[in-house]
Amino acid sequence: MLLMYPPRNRSLQKSKPKYLFAGLGTMGFPMAGHLSKNPNLDVYVFNRTSKISDKWVKKYHGAKLLSLNSCSIKFDGIITCLKDDASISSVILNSGLLKSIKTNAFIVDHSTTSLDLVSTISNHPDILDKKISFFDAPVSGGEVGAINGLLSIMLGGPKAKLSKVKIVLEAYSKSITHIGPSGHGQLTKMVNQLCIASLIQGLSEGIALGSKSNLNMNKVLEAISGGAAQSWQMDNRFKTMIKGDFDFGFAVDLMIKDLKIALNQSKKLDLNLSTSKSILKNYNKLSLSGDGNLDTSSLIKLLG
């Protein structure tokens, strides 16, 4: 079923490429918004919580789907940004959505997922039969990057089909790096998350030491932020960590999910990532204490 919200002009009625963006969470909401600003595209959105879709269509130029099961529209591309493997499987593989995508179209998944899911989608009979190009395209840059359209995209998929998806990805990114074939985007995101987790652990321990030593932490930041210790985490989280402000950003529970994916992959490769295992235990402690929705920088609370 399709519920059309009247666009601000009648341009949606023209014959233009049609794209569906599924998943209007913290990241997906503004990403779909940036995509809708392209006057040469028809953008449709879907979210399991319908009131979020209602909010989106009131703010941006587009229409919403009430259901994926009985959609009569034929899409040129589908973009997903969802929570986990189960959510993505439900939307892409088990909703009937593949009946609503054109032959030779594309699917771009911005979620962080397992390699097994990438393989399952890429090799699904309907994907192969309709010659659909699937790209695993996890992102980095957080909520701020999504809002400002400045995400970094790690892309895995068929290089020959890149031109198809660039019109979408360029709407909300500052960089698009094609890493390699299917799965390489997710592998790169695993590397990214392991690095970030270690940075946050180190930053937490450094701030804890400085604070317990009664240092002027603003002066400490001034002294070290221009040197080798500088990082995005330091620039954007140092001051909020000092204040104990964690009610924003990338949630602890999502980092737990991402670290589990990375550590599962490392196990398959006979790698013992002891530091990452220890950090995962710390994040699990936070989650069990009720802090699973706080920003990952809340790791410092365990050192209080």
Question: What kind of region is each of these model predictions?
Answer:
Residues 2-81, 111, 143, 178:
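NAD(P)+-binding Rossmann beta1-loop-alpha1 motif at the extreme N-terminus of oxidoreductases
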Residues 3-11, 15, 288-304:
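NAD(P)-dependent dehydrogenase/reductase Rossmann-like domain
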Residues 23, 216-226, 277-281:
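Beta-strand segments within the central parallel beta-sheet cores of soluble alpha/beta enzyme folds
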Residues 31-35, 121, 168, 209:
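Hydrophobic residues within alpha-helices
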Residues 68-134:
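Rossmann-fold NAD(P) dinucleotide-binding segment
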Residues 93, 112-194:
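Rossmann-fold dinucleotide-binding core
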Residues 148-156, 177, 181-213, 222-236, ...:
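Active-site-proximal catalytic alpha-helix in oxidoreductases
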Residues 182, 230-295:
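Interdomain hinge/lid region at the active-site interface
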